[in-house]
Amino acid sequence: MVDVQKRKKLLAKAAASASIPAIKGSVPLDSYDIKIIQYKNALYKLNELNRLLNVLVPHLKKKRDNDESYKIIPLVNFILSLCEGPIFNVSPVLAKRYHLLCRFQLIKLSEVQQRLSTNFIDVEGWMFPEEVPLDHYKSCIYNNSLQWKILNSLSCIAQNAIKIYNAKLRQILLERDAYKARSLPFDTSIIEDLLNPVEMTLILDLAVLINDPVRDKSTHSFYKLQWQVMEKLNSCVHSKIFPILRTYYNQLQKFSETRPTSLSNLQKDLPHWEWTLHRIYTFHLRVFSVLCVIISFSRQIFLPNKQHFLDIKTRLSSENVYHYDLIICELMALLSPECDDVTALFELQENLKFWTQTARTDNNSSRTPIFHLQPGLVVELFNNHICKIIPKLRSIMGLLSNWMDCWKYIEKNYKTFDETNDLRENLKEKLERDKALYLEVKNAKSKLKKKPSITKLPASSSPSPSPTSSASPSRQASLESIRTRARAHLASNSSRSPSVSPVRTTFNNKNAETKKSVVSPEKRKLINGRRPRSSSLQSYTNKQQTSYLNSTRHPSIAPPSKLNNQRSNSLQSSTMTLNQKIVQDTVRHLMNKSASTPNPSASSSLAPSPKVSSINNTSSGKSSSTLIANSSDTLAIETLTLDPESNSSELSIKRVRFAGVPPMTEAENPKPTKVGWYKKPAVLHYPPIPASAMIKPLQHKSKYNTLRQEEGFTFRKSLRDGLEWENGESGSETTMMPFGIEIKESTGHRIASKIRSKLR
C-alpha cells in the first residue's frame, strides 16, 4: 500500500509552496492545467485509434471481397487492450460499454449525450478480471462475425468519446483564460513527445490469417498466436516507448543528483524548464497508461491459459522447473484479480490522485493545490514518485520477457508422456536437480557481480580507485602514467651503481603512498603557483634545494650525443662554454674507445636477443621480467623480481651519461620553472687539486683556466676509478693528472678525497 502519510506530507508542502514567490518565467501547475493534460492524453490516443481503424477496416474488407477464401480475422480483443486505462472514464455509459466489449458482448450504438462539465478524469482502470474458460475464449477469438461487430462498436464509442473530450477541452481553456488573465497560454506541443501513443501502431498487426481451419485453429497454433502478440508488444515497448521515457527520466535524475540544486542547473538540464511540473505530471500519467496496456495484454493471455501453464506436463517440458515455477508465481501475484490492492498499478493510481487531491479552505470551500516551480520540489517529486516508477516498469517487463522465453522453450520441446509414467515422481526428481543447478548458477553470477572489474595496478603515487563506486566516480590513473612512474622509480634505484650486473628491485605501494603524502615547503610553494627566484639571484644552497626538487620530478637525463645541440644560457660566459665543449669532446672520445674494446666478462655472458619485453608469472606468485635493449654504445640487461602485490607490464633500463661515470645527482639536473625554457647547467664546484698535483707549468693565473684544470682533474680521476673497478684493480697509488700526467698521491690525500666524496 502507498504510504498515505507521505502523500499528505507532500500535499502540505505543495500547499505551503503556494505562498513562495514563483521563479520568474516559470508556469505553476494548477487544476486547470492538470485537466488539460488529462483531456489531451485521451484525445491523442482516441484520435490515433480512429485514424488507424479507418486504415485497417477498408483494407480488410477489400481483401475479403476480392477473394472469399482469403479470410483475415481482426483481433479486436487485443485492440481493446491498447485502449486500456482511464480514457473511456469520461462518461460512465461509455466506460460500461467498453467493459462489455472486452467480455465479447455486443452493445448499443446510440450516441451518449454528456452534460458539459470540467471534472477530473477518474484514473481507475479495468483489467480483464475474469478467468474465462479457454474453450470459450478461443471460440470468441476465431469468431469472424463477432470480431467485426466488436470492431464497429469500438469505432462508435471512440468517436463519441472524442466529441465529449473536445467539448470539455474548449470549456477548460475558457475557464483557464478567465482565471489566469495574464498567464502564458498552455502550448500542448511541449508535452506532445511524452503523450504520443506509439503503441497504437500495433493495431495494423493485430489480425490472423486463416487458410486451413483445422491446422490454423489448433491448440498449438493458438498458443503460438498469443506468444506472437506478446512478442510484438514487448518489442514495441522496448524499441518505441522506453527510449522516450528513459530520456526524460535521465534528465530528471541528472538534475536531482546535481548539487547544489539551483535554477541555473534546472534551466540547463531540463527541456522546457518553465513547464517542468507539467512535464512531470504528463510523464507520470504516460507511465500509468503504458502499464495499464501491458498488464491488460498479460492478463488476457495468462488467465485463460493458466491451467496450461500450471500443468505437470508443461512444467516437465520446461528447461528448468524451479526457475519456471518462480516466474509463474510472480506472474500470478502480478496479474491475479484478487491481488489488485498490492500491485504497482494501484500505487501509480494513488500517486496520480495526489496531484488532484482537494483541500478545504477557511471558508469551507474545496480547492486543489497550486504547485509552484521550485528546484527543491522537483527533486522531491523525483525521489518520492518518479524514481520508483521506471524500476517497477523495468522489473515487470523483465518478468514478462522471462515468461515468454520459458513459454517458447516449452512449445518447442513439448513432450508426450505415457499415462503409465509416474509424472509426479519425475517432476519431483527434475525439480530437485534443477533447483540445485539454478542456485549454483545464481551464486556464481552473484560472485561475478561482487568481484571488482578493475584489477589493482601498482602505482607509486596513488592506489587504484574502487570499481564499485559508480555514483561518484573518481579520476583513475591511466596505464601510461603508471608505467612512466614505474620507469622513474626503477631508474632512480638502478642508477646508484654504474655496473651492468642484474639489479633486483621490489615495489612497495605502502612506501610509495607514504612518500607521496610528504610535501616539502619548496614544493608547496610551487603548487601554490609562486615562481621561485631566478637562478642568477640565488645562492648556492638555494640552487641545490631547487634543483633537487626539480630533478625528483624529472629524473630523465639527456644522452651525451644531444649535449652539443643544446642552446647555451645567454648569461653564461664564452670561456665556460668552451670549457664544457672540451670536456664533452674528451668524454665522447673515451666512450668511442671503450665501445671498440668491450669488456670480455660482460660480452661473454650476454647472448644476442631481440628487442622485446616480457613478463613470466610463476606459480609462487612472483613475476620475473627481463628487458633487453641494444643501444649504440652499450648493452644492458636488467632482471627485476616483483612481489606478489605488484603487477607491472613494462620496465625501463638504467640510463647513464657514459660508461664509467655515475648518473647526474639531483643538484646537477635542475628542471626549468616554465614551459619552453631549457635547463641552465648547474655551476660545478670541483674539489681543489692536491698540492702534490700542482705542477708549475700548469699553474695559470686565469680563474677559468684554474676551474678547467680542477674539472679535468676530477673527470680523469673518476674515469680511472671506474676502469680500475671494472678490471678488479684496487689499491693503486698512482693518480692521473690532466692530460695524462701520472703522479704519486699520499695517504692523507686519499683519505681526504674519500671524505669529500662521501660528503658529496
From Swiss-Prot:
Residue stretches of biased makeup (Polar residues): 534-554
UniProt keyword annotations, A-Z: Cytoplasm, Phosphoprotein
Listed transmembrane segments: none
One record GO biological process: chromosome segregation
Residues of the signal peptide: none
Localization of this protein: Cytoplasm
Organism listed in the record: Saccharomyces cerevisiae (strain ATCC 204508 / S288c) (Baker's yeast)
Misc note: Present with 227 molecules/cell in log phase SD medium.
Protein name, UniProt field: GLC7-interacting protein 4
